[in-house]
UniProtKB/Swiss-Prot annotation:
Root EC class: transferase
Keyword Mitochondrion: no
Record-linked PANTHER family: PROTEIN SET DOMAIN GROUP 41
SUPFAM superfamilies noted in UniProt: SET domain
Species whose genome carries this gene: Arabidopsis thaliana (Mouse-ear cress)
InterPro entries: SET_dom, SET_dom_sf
Record Gene3D superfamilies: 1.10.220.160, 6.10.140.2220, SET domain
GO molecular function: methyltransferase activity
Protein name: Protein SET DOMAIN GROUP 41
Superkingdom of origin organism: Eukaryota
Similarity comment text for this entry: Belongs to the class V-like SAM-binding methyltransferase superfamily.
Lineage: Eukaryota, Viridiplantae, Streptophyta, Embryophyta, Tracheophyta
Length: 558
């Protein structure tokens, strides 16, 4: 099944009004903090347990269901609750069950043929049949409901990117296929936020999917009216007859990992243009890119290498990933985590090729390096909170530097693949916020509300500016590059790995500019300027993807 555009669709167009879910459920960890119906934050004293209002409490009958049996693993309780809601809240069409349920593909035959999950589906179906007091002779319908959820449900994120739970939408959305280079994305709004509240001036709403109505035979909004609403938005220009696509997974992965992810979650292999490209697309080549350096040009302290390049790269990847996992599991402290990861990023690993010693380092855009930057920015920020007063500023500074470098890397990837806009927006926003927090630590008497101006970017925020996104981003990045000329060496001081890069948007390993002495006031002003440009660029990308803007950038008088 697929959905195609009936006519040309411009970039930054919402493809249809918000869709209500057929069924949804919070993850267990958010049941006590968010409304189980609309996913909004609960008030301090909610009128009803687990719900923000009496109206929301009437929409959900199964939150207090019996204890889930352990046999349902790896199926999550949220999957079971969503399946229960699906069977309870809709007039279920069983005519093509178990292969389809309410026009949704279930993948029942594939999932039940997989011994790693079929037993869990069977136990979960029996559990659901008991809860709803089914008197049917078999649990085929319950199995179909679970399979429909596993195949079609999407993870619901709040405005900060936090995964709150899952939701299942009708075929108006579920028939939109996956691509690793999609032309659209989707976002969520809750019932407390009207569609017009999140609709910005430059956003259009399309009714250009008549083909969708003809194929689906369903209303665009045939959900139950409750739960997080979904909006699909174009992030590229879409030609008439072109298929509408979104991404089901994290796109900042090389082809092999994406294929594995899609198969484990959705039981299909992607054959989109990016996956089928031979040779691999540029973004996939650098997501697995390594640099081979002559041994004499490297420093001491390498890890034991091997005689096989792929094996050596695998060792680097595994070592960094193990350090990240140990840090996230609290098995190592932030300081140890930083030392372990940075030693591999900076020194690389030795290996022999044709009896000659060489050194391998991960490309700055390598997917493992991206995860490392995220972890290092977090670890250094924690160290800034836990450290003695004398090094708080240093830890905050390096945390901001890693976040800014990650933003620069994401821009490089975004230039090659426009569907990376979602990730890039998040990274630039995080960098801007960390730099914004850093500024007052550099000079306490200088207010962050100081008059920070950039005349070059002054017109980018005006409502009558219709310049192309490429032109706007080019101007912002030009300013970032200029400001970094005098700020990058200060931000990266004491961090050997980042010190070797020319700037956060230039990954050349040769530094041409020596560190320039600046007063604390100059440093603070430049950090604020850098922060404002990061937030401005994040707003540009967020508007592209979601039609929304942050309020942080308004603090600066650009």
């Amino acid at each position: 099944m697929e959905i195609r555009a009936a006519e040309d669709i411009e970039i930054r167009t919402d493809l249809f009004p918000p869709l209500s879910p057929l069924a949804s459920s919070l993850y267990d960890s958010f049941l006590s903090s968010h409304c189980s119906s609309c996913f909004s934050l609960l008030p301090p004293s909610p009128p009803q347990p687990l719900y923000c209002s009496a109206a929301c409490s009437l929409t959900d009958s199964f939150t207090n269901s019996p204890q889930f049996p352990p046999e349902i693993t790896p199926i999550l309780p949220s999957d079971i609750r969503t399946s229960l809601h699906l069977l309870n809240s809709t007039a279920v069409d069983t005519s093509s069950s178990p292969h389809r349920l309410n026009n949704l593909l279930t993948n029942h035959h594939l999932l039940m043929a997989d011994p790693s999950i079929s037993v869990a589906i069977h136990h979960a179906a029996n559990f659901i049949a008991t809860v709803i007091r089914s008197n049917r002779k078999n649990t085929e319908l319950e199995e179909a409901a679970i399979c429909a959820v596993l195949t079609n449900a999407v993870e619901v994120h709040d405005s900060n990117g936090l995964a709150l739970g899952i939701a299942l939408y009708n075929s108006s959305f579920s028939w939109i296929n996956h691509s690793c280079s999609p032309n659209s994305c989707y976002r969520f709004v809750n019932n407390r936020t009207s569609y017009h509240d999140v609709h910005v001036t430059n956003t259009e709403t399309s009714s250009n999917l008549e083909l969708q109505e003809q194929v689906c035979g369903t209303s665009l909004n045939s959900g139950n009216g409750n739960g997080p609403k979904l909006i699909v938005r174009s992030i590229k220009r879409i030609k008439s007859g072109e298929e509408i696509t979104v991404s089901y997974i994290d796109l900042l992965q090389p082809t092999g990992l994406r294929q594995s992810d899609l198969w484990s979650k959705y039981r299909f292999m992607c054959n989109c243009g990016r996956c089928a490209a031979s040779p691999p697309a540029y973004v996939d080549s650098i997501l697995e890119g390594v640099l081979t350096l002559e041994s004499e040009k490297t420093t001491v302290g390498h890890f034991d290498g091997s005689t096989n390049k792929d094996e050596a790269v695998g060792k680097m990847n595994d070592y960094i990933q193990e350090a990240i996992d140990d840090f996230l599991s609290d098995n190592i402290d932030p300081k140890t985590c930083c030392e372990m990861i940075e030693s591999v990023l900076h020194h690389g690993i030795q290996f022999k090729e044709d009896s000659q010693p060489h050194c391998l380092r991960l490309h700055a855009c390598h997917y493992v390096a991206l995860n490392a930057y995220i972890t290092l920015a977090t670890a250094y920020r924690i160290r800034s909170i836990d450290s003695e007063t004398g090094i708080v500023c240093d830890m905050s500074r390096i945390s901001a530097a890693y976040s800014l470098f990650l933003a620069g890397v994401s821009h490089h990837l975004f230039c090659a693949e426009r569907s990376f806009a979602i990730s890039a927006a998040k990274f630039w926003k995080n960098a801007g916020e960390l730099l914004f927090d850093l500024a007052p630590k550099l000079l306490m008497e200088l207010s962050v509300e100081s008059d920070v101006k950039c005349t070059k970017c002054l017109m980018l925020e005006t409502s009558n500016s219709h310049r192309d996104i490429k032109e706007k981003s080019r101007q912002i990045l030009s300013c970032v590059r200029d400001i970094s000329q005098v700020t990058w060496s200060f931000l990266t001081r004491g961090c050997p790995y980042l010190e070797k890069f020319r700037s956060p948007v230039d990954f050349s390993l040769t530094r041409t500019n020596g560190e320039r002495e600046e007063s604390s006031k100059d440093q603070t002003v430049n950090v604020l300027l850098l922060s404002s440009h990061c937030l401005l660029y994040a707003d540009l990308l967020t508007d592209l993807c979601y039609g929304q803007k942050s309020h942080l950038v308004s603090r600066f008088r650009l």
